[in-house]
Amino acid sequence: MNLSATILLAFGMSMDAFAASIGKGATLHKPKFSEAVRTGLIFGAIETLTPLVGWGLGMLASQFILEWNHWIAFILLVFLGGRMIVEGFRGDSDEACEAPHRHGFWLLVTTAFATSLDAMAVGVGLAFLQVSIVTTALAIGCATFIMSTLGMMVGRFIGPLLGKRAEILGGIVLIGIGSEILWSHFAG
């Protein structure tokens, strides 16, 4: 795979993480740049590892992985998105209830993992091609770091405009991503 194809693949794989990080940024109370970088690092690290795992699994059992990855991503994203929607509607009527200043580590890891399962499937496919899996995985991770960090900062500006509805919107985005993954599997 040539350099331009690798870069296009990397940024294509980062789009789900970008959308999810916009939703995450919108639900925080004025996230700082350091929080955006933290989120980018978590998403980027996981997005780097999943194609490597997929590549390894592709060498072993590609058919099983390809049959189930879309369902796993869909269930995780619908669960996380549903939780965000419920929290958005549950909020206190007085505005004294302030948005969090940062998301928990495991919530970010779970979201990052759910949005990176397509990269794992790509890794399975790459197992059958003559590519440098390490270079490709690093490119995907770097692109995801950049896009997730930018997504958090974009979400920072959207969040104050939406208020408590930002959490509902973030949940809808996650459910939409999960649905798109499932739809792509059955339509494609």
Curated annotation (Swiss-Prot):
Top-rank taxon: Bacteria
Cellular component, GO annotation: plasma membrane
Coiled-coil zones: none
Residues spanning the membrane: 3-23, 41-61, 62-82, 107-129, 143-163, 168-188
Similarity annotation: Belongs to the MntP (TC 9.B.29) family.
PANTHER family assigned to the protein according to its UniProt record, in alphabetical order: MANGANESE EFFLUX PUMP MNTP-RELATED
Name of this protein: Putative manganese efflux pump MntP
